[in-house]
Structures are given as structure tokens and as C-alpha cells.
Regions:
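Hydrophobic alpha-helical segments and their boundary regions
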Residues: 10, 33, 95, 139, ...
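Ubiquitous "structural anchor" signal
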Residues: 18, 74, 247, 316, ...
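Residues in and immediately flanking transmembrane alpha helices
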Residues: 15-16, 76, 206
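Sec-dependent N-terminal signal peptides of Gram-positive bacterial secreted proteins and lipoproteins
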Residues: 4-24, 406-425
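Active-site-adjacent loops and short helices of periplasmic peptidoglycan-processing enzymes
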Residues: 22-176, 180-189
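Domain-terminus/edge residues, biased toward the C-terminal soluble/receptor-binding domains
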Residues: 155-156, 169-172, 176-410, 421-427, ...
Length: 439
């Protein structure tokens, strides 16, 4: 146990060091933009940042979370889903002078239209409608779901007060948190298609609105004829309020390297355009491909328990990983530790991780990334325990009955864990297959 605690403490100290105020900032120093963060879209690794944990008003980039939760609920089944506009969807925005698509109370809106209206037209009434969709019928329920998702993602500098981003003292996020929100949202069915659409979207007439509505993506950095055009940007969400100033989040890709870039509190629109270009040009110049970090042979023993007894131990090790390293850094600049619980209890997903820390010196942000660790011996241990605790039926006395019941309980738990472990292995394999590791 002491070994596991010491190992966990080492990981925590590494994580704290990664984001300590004295850590060298490897990216450009911006003056017209208050904060930014660039991460690897595949691993979530922080590559460059300035004030990335500062809590700021996000404006409409809030809608990344709103859209992500709507896509999660729909699971790709957008067709034939209609949402009915409530009184609150419309009239809670009265006097805000906010962006909208003139939804009317009682209007029946296809889910697909609501998604594209919220994404492309930045419709606050559309965001309200979506919040009711995934929030159990109320905007308040949707906001609660947004905060619950932020907590699940481990975000410490985010709190939502609404689903659209109108400024509120209790509505804030950070560049780091927003980058991780987008990274999560990109895993939801249909979100990336929604986020990266450049073509005009047409919303047909509804039961109360006879006219056709047209939505255009509003980011000049994605318009080929614009002087601000950046071809690497695949998708983006823009935001603005008088308090928040200009906020921005995008997914960009160049030569197989996928980055998420967030900027907040750019003072004027041209500051945002110029600073995003500066950040992406710098990042793509520094990070030209993924480096294979082979398994380092770091191992640990993890106790396995079930049914009130200890079943044995398994071996946990670092699996190796592909990381974005700045030019000038090699695998020798990466260290690895293991993050293990004190005990693995059957029936619960084994929360075991390898933590890779990049020691970036003055060319890359010093930061860490967690990946699922490799576990060996668990299937064999579970199979052995299942066989050992399920004896053939025989006459037993009262004491043996109690022992037999315990054995059956352990055996049932083990069998359930075998099935669960299969699911865990499939889940980890699926996640690895889904992530885009480019070379």
C-alpha cells in the first residue's frame, strides 16, 4: 500500500509541477489577447499557453458544450426528432439584444435545424431549445447537465449559468477547460460534422413560420476569399459580448497534426484574427509529427479484491504512447509514472493510468498526459478465482453453508468482473482505434 501511495504522490507532484506558475511558457507572448491554450486534439496534451486557467467570460463559445451534450443525447439519430419551442426559450432573452433566429413559442423545430442554427447562426433561442432537449424539459436542467459534464471532465475553472453565453457573473470558463470541452465534444456522434460545416444551411418553413431561414458560418478565418483565411482551420466557434470581448475556439489540422486552439478576451476582432494566426503558425512550425514513445518498462503491482477477500495481484505497466514533441525534443525528454488506486475492486472499471510528462525545457510547455495503462494477469486471475470459488454441489453443515454462500458470492462477482473486464478492454481498444494518431 505504501508503494502505491508513494507512486500516486509522485504523479500528483508531477502534475502540479506541469502547471506551476514558474513553468516555462513555450508559446508566443500575446498582448492584445488575455489568454490562450493550444492542445493536441488526440491526447489533450498542453502544447502552449498563456493564462490558460484564468476564469473569463466565454460568450458564445459556451455553445460547444451545449451542442456536445445535444449530440451525445441524440447519438447520431437526428432525423424525425422535433422539438417544441417553449415560452422561456424565447422570452428569457427579452432585452438582451442577443443573436437569435426568431423562434416562436409553440414552433416545432427539427433537431437538425436547431443544431445548425445554434452552431452557425449562434442562435441563443436555439441553444435554449437544445438545453431543454438534453435537460429533461427545462433550460435549468440543461444548465445543470452542462455543469455536471464539466465536473465529469475534471474541469476546475468552469461554471455555466446559461446554455448560450450571455454574460453573467456566475458564468465562466478558462482556455484550458474550453479546449478540453471541445476535445470531448468531438467524440460525440455527429459533432465534428456539425462543427466543421462551411456550406450554407437551409432551414425550411415550420408549423408557425412560413419563411425559409438560411444560416452561414461566420468565421472569416474559414472563408477562402477573406484576407484572414487560415486553411488549416477545420471548424470553429466564435463568441463576443461587451464584457467577454472576443473569444474563439477551433480545430485545426496540418500534415496530420490536429490541434485545438482557444483564445479569450481579445480586445478587437482583428486582434483575434492576427493572434490565432500567430499561434497556429508557431504551433505547426514546432510540432511537425508524432513521436513514438515506446513502453519504458515501468511496472507496479495492483491488489485485486472481490467478495470481501483478496484474490491476488496483477501487473500494471506503461503501454507506450504517441506524443507531439517540439523539434529538438526526443523520447529521452519524456518520463513516465503510474497512477494506481490502492486496490482494484471487481465490478469497477480498473482506473489505472500511465502518466507521461514532457520536460520541454524552453521549447515546449512542461505538461503531462494520462493514458490507460496496460494490465496483465487479470483475466487469468479472474478465471482461476472463478474456478476455485465454484465447487461442485455437496452436503454441507451450517458453517459450510455460510462458506459456500461466500464462495458463490465471490464467484458471481468474479464472473461479472470477467464480463466487465471484456467490456473495458473493448472500450479501451475502441477509444484507441477512434483517436487519430497521425505521422
Amino acid at each position: 500500500m505504501k508503494k502505491h501511495i508513494a507512486m500516486l504522490c509522485a504523479v500528483l507532484l508531477t502534475a502540479l509541477a506541469a502547471f506551476a506558475p514558474g513553468a516555462a511558457a513555450a508559446g508566443p507572448a500575446l498582448t492584445a489577447t488575455e489568454a490562450y491554450c493550444i492542445i493536441d486534439a488526440d491526447t489533450g496534451l498542453v502544447l502552449a499557453q498563456q493564462n490558460m486557467n484564468e476564469e473569463l467570460h466565454p460568450a458564445s463559445i459556451t455553445k460547444v458544450m451545449t451542442l456536445g451534450l445535444a449530440c451525445e443525447k441524440a447519438q447520431g439519430k437526428w432525423d424525425n426528432v422535433k422539438l417544441t419551442v417553449s415560452h422561456e426559450d424565447v422570452y428569457s432573452l427579452a432585452g438582451t439584444d442577443s443573436s437569435h433566429i426568431a423562434l416562436q413559442e409553440g414552433e416545432e423545430v427539427p433537431l437538425t435545424d436547431a443544431l445548425y442554427a445554434t452552431m452557425m447562426a449562434s442562435a441563443n433561442d436555439g441553444a435554449n431549445l437544445l438545453a431543454e432537449y438534453f435537460g429533461g424539459g427545462s433550460i435549468e436542467g440543461g444548465v445543470a447537465a452542462m455543469n455536471a459534464q464539466a465536473k465529469e471532465l475534471g474541469l476546475e475553472h468552469t461554471h455555466f449559468a446559461n446554455p448560450h453565453g450571455i454574460s453573467d457573473e456566475d458564468h465562466y470558463t478558462s482556455c484550458y477547460d474550453m479546449a478540453q470541452i471541445l476535445r470531448w465534444a468531438l467524440t460525440q456522434p455527429g459533432f465534428e460534422t456539425l462543427f466543421t460545416r462551411n456550406e450554407m444551411y437551409t432551414m425550411g418553413p415550420t408549423n408557425v413560420q412560413p419563411v425559409t431561414r438560411y444560416f452561414h458560418q461566420q468565421d472569416k478565418m474559414r472563408v477562402g476569399s477573406s484576407r484572414y483565411y487560415i486553411p488549416a482551420i477545420l471548424g470553429s466557434k466564435i463568441g463576443y459580448t461587451n464584457i467577454a470581448r472576443y473569444s474563439y475556439v477551433c480545430l485545426a489540422e496540418q500534415n496530420g497534426v490536429r490541434l485545438i486552439c482557444v483564445t479569450m478576451q481579445s480586445q478587437i476582432k482583428t486582434d483575434k484574427y492576427n493572434d490565432v494566426r500567430t499561434l497556429l503558425d508557431d504551433a505547426f512550425a514546432r510540432y511537425t509529427g508524432y513521436t513514438e514513445i515506446p513502453a519504458q518498462g515501468v511496472t507496479g503491482e495492483l491488489e485485486v479484491a472481490g467478495g470481501g477477500s483478496t484474490l491476488g495481484t496483477v501487473t500494471v505497466s506503461d503501454p507506450g504512447v504517441k506524443l507531439l514533441l517540439a523539434d529538438g525534443l526526443t523520447a529521452a525528454d519524456v518520463s513516465v509514472t503510474l497512477e494506481l488506486p490502492e486496490q482494484y475492486l471487481l465490478g469497477v472499471d480498473p482506473a489505472v493510468y500511465a502518466v507521461y510528462t514532457i520536460h520541454g525545457r524552453d521549447v515546449q510547455e512542461t505538461a503531462s498526459v494520462r493514458v490507460p495503462a496496460a494490465v496483465t494477469g487479470l483475466e487469468e486471475l479472474l478465471a482461476k478465482s472463478a474456478n476455485a470459488t465454484l465447487p461442485a454441489s455437496r452436503d454441507v453443515g451450517p458453517k459450510r453453508i455460510a462458506g459456500g454462500l461466500l464462495a458463490i458470492s465471490v464467484g458471481a462477482t468474479v464472473l461479472a468482473a470477467l464480463a466487465a473486464f471484456g467490456v473495458v478492454r473493448l472500450r479501451i481498444k475502441w477509444k484507441k482505434g477512434k483517436s487519430r494518431s497521425k505521422h
